[in-house]
């Protein structure tokens, strides 16, 4: 791509939480950002925050588990902002339950959004990266990839993201495309609030209990994850690929 051309990123699940923080950070880093979530209207706050700071952004609605919607979303970003060469696969859902209570539908939905969604988004976006001979793919995993009670579906999906990432690094490296996975620990989001509700704890007590188990003595914020992704999405991270980086405030074992 021309030296002075603005890089374009797509961040999925970017209406709120980690995705919104990542979209804003990449925009602050100078990228135009496709802000993608299930409903384009839900992305308005993120887009407005980026534009108010002088950045360029586009709200895009798509179900990442549906191939036709994914292709249309990537095409829209390429048309309106330019060919995407940075992709952050962050979209995710929870359907927590103990294994014997978990329905096949809950299993399929979680793996569909996390794994199928990352596969479809990457397949659509990598074409632009190959053409540019440059790309950055960052897949959101989780500390739950190591196993977590009540999250058989989510843990399997997040572990799968790590294997998917390493394979992408091997297949796409020849095109100067890197692929890395970021695995957050406890981050204050709607998802962790939902987990607190599932175990019948107030979110404040849940955070306090978690902080006692974390080496740095606090829970994480979405911006902690965004800082890490900012580096992995940068030109300076061209020799970092196929890695899983835990953003968890300390070792997990």
Segments from the language model and where they lie:
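Active-site helix of classical SDR
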Residues: 122, 157, 165
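The beta1-alpha1 cofactor-binding region of Rossmann-like NAD(H)/NADP(H)-dependent oxidoreductases
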Residues: 40-41, 61-72, 104, 223-224
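Substrate-binding pocket helix/loop in short-chain dehydrogenase/reductase
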Residues: 98-99, 106-111, 206, 210
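Active-site loop-to-helix junction immediately N-terminal to the catalytic Tyr of the SDR YXXXK motif
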Residues: 102, 148-156, 167
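Short, flexible catalytic-loop segment of classical short-chain dehydrogenase/reductase
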Residues: 184-194
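Short C-terminal tail/terminal secondary-structure segment
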Residues: 212, 218, 229-230, 241-253
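Alpha-helical segment proximal to the catalytic Tyr-Lys
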Residues: 127, 170-174, 238
């Amino acid at each position: 791509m021309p030296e002075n051309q603005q890089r374009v990123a797509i961040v999925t699940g970017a209406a709120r939480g980690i995705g919104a923080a990542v979209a804003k950070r990449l925009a602050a880093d100078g990228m135009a950002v496709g802000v993608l979530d299930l409903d384009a209207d839900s992305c308005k706050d993120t887009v407005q925050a980026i534009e108010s700071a002088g950045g360029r952004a586009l709200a895009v609605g798509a179900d990442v588990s549906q191939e036709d919607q994914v292709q249309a979303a990537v095409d829209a970003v390429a048309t309106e902002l330019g060919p995407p060469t940075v992709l952050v696969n962050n979209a995710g859902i929870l359907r927590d339950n103990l294994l014997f209570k978990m329905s096949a539908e809950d299993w399929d939905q979680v793996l569909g959004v996390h794994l199928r969604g990352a596969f479809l988004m990457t397949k659509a976006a990598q074409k632009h990266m190959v053409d540019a001979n440059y790309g950055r793919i960052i897949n959101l995993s989780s500390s739950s990839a190591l196993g977590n009670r009540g999250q058989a579906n989510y843990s399997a999906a997040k572990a799968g993201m790590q294997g998917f990432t390493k394979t992408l690094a091997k297949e796409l490296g020849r095109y100067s495309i890197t692929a890395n996975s970021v695995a957050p620990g406890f981050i204050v989001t709607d998802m962790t609030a939902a987990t607190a509700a599932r175990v019948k704890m107030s979110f404040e007590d849940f955070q306090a209990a978690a902080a006692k188990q974390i080496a740095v003595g606090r829970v994480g914020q979405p911006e902690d994850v965004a800082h890490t992704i900012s580096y992995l999405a940068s030109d300076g991270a061209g020799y970092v690929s196929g890695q899983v980086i835990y953003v968890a405030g300390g070792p997990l074992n």
